[in-house]
Amino acid sequence: MEVSQAASGTDGVRERRGSFEAGRRNQDEAPQSGMNGLPKHSYWLDLWLFILFDLALFVFVYLLP
């Protein structure tokens, strides 16, 4: 009888912890900016900057004497 009460007590703790973590997860989500739903940081900009930097570095190394 005591074992079943202890087991049910741990399940209650797990349920409470799970609901707390779920609530905390919702608060940690980044808010969406604008109406189009894009994140605040655009990774397309990072991609294009990387490509441009890569091309500039290639041209610089290619033209070295």
From Swiss-Prot:
Spans annotated as Disordered: 1-36
TM annotation in the entry: 44-64
Keywords: Acetylation, Endoplasmic reticulum, Membrane, Phosphoprotein, Transmembrane, Transmembrane helix
GO cellular component, one term: endoplasmic reticulum membrane
Tissues/organs with expression: In the embryo, expressed in heart, epidermal epithelium, salivary gland, brown fat, intestinal epithelium and bladder urothelium.
PTM-bearing positions, type N-acetylmethionine: M1
Location(s) in or outside the cell: Endoplasmic reticulum membrane
Biased composition (Basic and acidic residues): 12-28
Function: Inhibits the activity of the calcium ATPases ATP2A2/SERCA2 and ATP2A3/SERCA3 by decreasing their apparent affinity for Ca(2+).
Name by which UniProt lists this protein: Sarcoplasmic/endoplasmic reticulum calcium ATPase regulator ARLN
